[in-house]
UniProtKB/Swiss-Prot annotation:
All ranges on the Cytoplasmic side of the membrane: 142-179, 238-257, 300-749, 797-813, 870-883, 945-950
Gene: Calx
Name assigned to this protein: Sodium/calcium exchanger Calx
Impact when changing residue 198 to P: Disruption in the ability to maintain electric potential upon stimulation with light
Amino-acid positions noted as binding Ca(2+) 3 in the UniProt annotation, renumbered to this chain: 455, 515-516, 551-552
Tissue: Ubiquitously expressed with higher expression in head compared to body (at protein level). Enriched in photoreceptor cells of the eye (at protein level). In the adult head, expressed in retina, optic ganglia and all neuronal tissues.
Amino acid sequence: MQLLLKSIFTCALFVIFVYATAQSLLKVQETEARQAYLNVTSSSSSNLSQDDGHFLSRRLRQVSHGEEGDEGAPSQMDDELEQMTKVHGEAPDAEELRECSEGLVLPLWMPQRNISVGDRLVRGFVYFVLLIYLFVGVSIIADRFMAAIEAITSIERAVVVKGPNNTKQVMHVRIWNETVANLTLMALGSSAPEILLSVIEIYAKDFESGDLGPGTIVGSAAYNLFMIIAVCMIWIPAGEVRRIRHLRVFFVTALFSVFAYVWLWLILSVFTPGVILVWEAIVTLLFFPLTVLWAYIAERRLLVYKYMDKNYRVNKRGTVVAGEHDQVEMDAEKGPKQPMVTSARGNDAEAFDEARREYITLLTELRQKYPDADLEQLEMMAQEQVLARSSKSRAFYRIQATRKMVGSGNLMRKIQERAHSDLTEVKAQLHAGDDEEADDPIRMYFEPGHYTVMENCGEFEVRVVRRGDISTYASVEYETQDGTASAGTDFVGRKGLLSFPPGVDEQRFRIEVIDDDVFEEDECFYIRLFNPSEGVKLAVPMIATVMILDDDHAGIFAFTDSVFEITESVGRFELKVMRYSGARGTVIVPYWTENDTATESKDYEGARGELVFENNESEKFIDLFILEESSYEKDVSFKVHIGEPRLAPDDELAAKIKEVEKKPVQDLTELDRILLLSKPRNGELTTAYVRIRESQEFKATVDKLVAKANVSAVLGTSSWKEQFKDALTVIPADESEFDNDDEEEEVPSCFSYVSHFVCLFWKVLFAFVPPTDICGGYVTFVVSIFVIGVITAIIGDAASYFGCALNIKDSVTAILFVALGTSIPDTFASMIAAKHDEGADNCIGNVTGSNAVNVFLGIGLAWTIAAVYHSSHGMTFNVEPGTIGFAVALFCGEALIAIMLIMFRRWHKGIGAELGGPKVSKYISAAILVFLWVFYVVICILEAYDVIRV
């Protein structure tokens, strides 16, 4: 069906073109015949005039009658020729055969007189091909211009907002308001050729009015409103709809887009017919900032708009009071009413939170889809999806469309590369502190800082490490210090010097522990580092703690702390159970988990089992597995218990204790009592709370990635190297956004290669334009608009020569050919936006806004310059209403029909949206819009050639 519509559309254009060309060439042929006939007649008249003037008139009449009889030429033409020869002595009206005038940039194809029809057709074809190539070039440089505009409008500033728990949070928001950007720089970027053509034509014609510039603007407006919206209606996938979100802004731009052409009609035909005064031109130009201001007020709900969401009633005293909020948003999606949540944090903060929630939701979905992928891979895929789904500007879709047409590939590939670089950059920032040790001074410390030894271990080894620069010699002294353990009784005191030759990063020494047979509590002593050599600093731990466990007791068992705080991304967590005050025998300690605020199988895996402490073993670990949900904010806990410890049945100490327990109390010796006291028992900390919090690294990663989720960055370039690489590389224009499962590399299609080599000249030429990263895009902005101006001037000359070669009027060339050439990229951009955007603002809202801006800025600026110039020279700026006035009036009527059709589709229960909807309704609506455009073009052409007179 889409192919059929494209074929019908192409055939309609071809028929219109053939008709206009045939009519023009017919007039050319008739005029050439008249000219030849007149030349012959004039030559005969010149020879006879010396003899008899009366004979001349009679002879002319005879020849006239003879021609009528022999050749069948109309007598009316002969009478006109005779009359004109008598009165003027010259050729017929010069308008019948237009002679081309020299252009502003493009040289004129000579000669201009005595050209055959075949020559004119060849010249017309050459100019037509040149126009197409120029349209491609201006489309490519316009994309550079749009990228610069995107870089300018995406400038951000840091603001501090309060989080849900009154925590301060720094976020970056755009300085430019979206509506203001769309109606100013974005509109200028998408319509720069039309606007500049209007201004350049005024200058090229010595500040006199022309038909090409205004005709292009009016023709482009008609094509945008009718054809682009029609194509977007049927381009929406089956079963989907797209609605305008900012309906207030759409109403403002739609109102001004119609009023703009009503205003043109007023100043052309009503106020001062045929004359544009200075005040009229200036007011036309001032309507541009007024449109932007009004749209901004509507979008921000300022002035009267802030009262439009409230209901009002009159109380008993006759006072108007505000009622309850009606909870209906004009730009809300169709569906159940939702209460409005007012937040002091502002729209930017709410948008940031929404983007963050979307990122986390995507991460959860991807975790379920790819359960074997690690967190970093999931974060990469989530960032790709966030960038792909994030809000995109008109510039993105315009550049995306052009890149596909000229073989430069899909912007989604750049998004994928950007996601990888973003994640790498964020991870590097988060771990930056881990890689800065090389710049620190030389440090020495114990590793580890805590030692637990048995009383009967004999000796144990202590390790001291050096970090930083190890290329020099360094030294440090150490000594033992008493704690609850005393030197000489529990250990052998020691003092010494540790030397670190160049290249050595650690040294070790040994401490001896003294064993005895007396039961005693656990004891500890310390080892201290001091007096480091020059250039060496002592770092923590500079004091090591040594715990001596008695080997005559089975031990006391407990957790090291009552609360353990972990992150959900830890995966496996080892919970330590300590055995102190002895480590004799094999002891079994039961353990189990219990829900608190955390839920088993959701937040953690339940565990139940027994720990077996072998003889002289002082610590064991309970393996706990934490289930990660990638929650941005999480705070839940569960309990871990240890039960009563018991000696292993086959343990030697257990057998001895059983024998002693059989004895009467009065028969127990001192050694028996000590043996009974050595039974294992629990300490105070038998229950530990494990608190699961969100991962701070994950939280920081989310914040940074969401802050970086700006598609604008992929539109710009950072270096000339990147630009020339893009210009010389053929990239496949694949339609898919991402394909994580397909590892096969795609190959560019034949169309990609052909379009690449056709556009290679433009791509290489425009690679010299400065990158957008220079001065925030402003240099690119200035250079691009200059280049667009030069190419637009050439387009103006080529379009004029094209019309002149085929004797087509400038007004027809502008409305039909130039308007189409400048609007084709916008058509493809709107199609992509319609398919991928969630709303219809980038398809419909930008059309009405662009139409209004084109008139107020394009025609207003050009006419202001011309009116001021003529006024300064004491003259008036004359503009013949003619075809422009008729086209404006016709467009206004059809525009109202189109806008009413769009609103009818939105409010109709069976459709409910401007774009998409049921198959039959969307094709009928699109057909109506296509008919409006074809009717508009045909009537304008017929009026231009006086086939119909208004």
